[in-house]
């Protein structure tokens, strides 16, 4: 056996999550590993009929202070920190026996404090002290000691012991050490973030400041990327430790080439836009901007309508659907155009089978979920901008009619549709829509009136008529020229935030043209 393999003869098990505990303990006992344990863990092992020695018996000190002190003892930490070939004499002198394996997971601080009714006292009692101390001791001494922090690690740990006659490799011990230090860092960050957000420690259930004096973030790498935004930039994708269900980070790639930085940025824009619709919808995104969006009777209908908005820009785009993608729609897409990424909550067997004919197309499955990100962040030079996420919806009852003519029922439906799309278009954003489909999109211009003209131009290029359509603007019109441009194109109704110093002039312009206009009181800048 290679010298970097070391036997496991003595293990200390102390876990709050009992998942897989008994199977692990039974496998270790079968290899004649002596088990040490504490409190509820020892009780569970003993009730399973397995031999275990209490840490209190080892140290000669009982668990005290309601369990706050039980493993903070030289006989425990010396057993974890003792170095092979260096500390044997000292350990023998003080009666310290080596511990070769530590299996420990921490008090559930994160899951306790995520509850809105969590009291400060509950939070404090779930701050583990002895656990992180032992993890650090064992992880520091990876040259001799192995440490497991998660039930998901048990199977690989036992497999290596089985394959190597009860021994673990240096590579395995080091990998487990890194995972342990990461876990301690995550745990301490969660405690720091929670306590930093407590606005008043005198409150039983403290109010939490959404923007505390200090924040600590932890992300897990999902994959390396081919490159960053440009080929001369390197890149990788990381996800939150606890990703929100239904968001992009929960995707499963079913086929296709490796994802790029731009693929993921565009995919996020497409997915977030499409998941706000209840009826079958398709969103086509290019360079983080929707170039076609539609709601239809099914995926195929929605795709045809969305594609018709801007067939030229749809080349090399990202397509997102909010319903299971069927074979007929998959065939229609892949036979017609080059696609970078397909996204849907699921695919029928025929759709996946047909997609294999275009092996390079990246096919992503994102399970349904109603969760929303609470915050957005953006890096700037040596700093971080942080804000609450723009999750503001809009209902008919919130709209204020400000013109002489009120929108018709059909126009109101189209106005809300266009408003939802405009939220995901780069500012200055103008969206023309009719019958729950986009007719033209003007994005990212420094002048709002220019965005309006571009939306009309895109409609003309696609041979779609703007006459009778509605217009959504992500921010107010500073002058009447945007309304005049809309009227020239044939727009019949407008939705916008309002709030300009010249709202009166803008409203008067709409009345002159017989345009119905509603204010939302909400702006949707997107940069």
Curated annotation (Swiss-Prot):
Record keyword Lipid metabolism present: no
MGS-like domain location: 1-149
GO CC annotations on file: cytosol
Pfam assignment, any one: AICARFT_IMPCHas
Biological processes per GO annotation: 'de novo' IMP biosynthetic process
UniProt xrefs under SUPFAM superfamilies: Cytidine deaminase-like (SSF53927), Methylglyoxal synthase-like (SSF52335)
Annotated pathway: Purine metabolism; IMP biosynthesis via de novo pathway; 5-formamido-1-(5-phospho-D-ribosyl)imidazole-4-carboxamide from 5-amino-1-(5-phospho-D-ribosyl)imidazole-4-carboxamide (10-formyl THF route): step 1/1; Purine metabolism; IMP biosynthesis via de novo pathway; IMP from 5-formamido-1-(5-phospho-D-ribosyl)imidazole-4-carboxamide: step 1/1
Gene Ontology terms, MF aspect: IMP cyclohydrolase activity; phosphoribosylaminoimidazolecarboxamide formyltransferase activity
Keywords for this protein: Hydrolase, Multifunctional enzyme, Purine biosynthesis, Transferase
EC number of this enzyme: 2.1.2.3, 3.5.4.10
PROSITE patterns: MGS (PS51855)
Reactions catalysed according to its record: (6R)-10-formyltetrahydrofolate + 5-amino-1-(5-phospho-beta-D-ribosyl)imidazole-4-carboxamide = 5-formamido-1-(5-phospho-D-ribosyl)imidazole-4-carboxamide + (6S)-5,6,7,8-tetrahydrofolate; IMP + H2O = 5-formamido-1-(5-phospho-D-ribosyl)imidazole-4-carboxamide
Signal peptide residue numbers: none
Family that this chain belongs to: Belongs to the PurH family.
Record remark: domains: The IMP cyclohydrolase activity resides in the N-terminal region.
Protein name: Bifunctional purine biosynthesis protein PurH
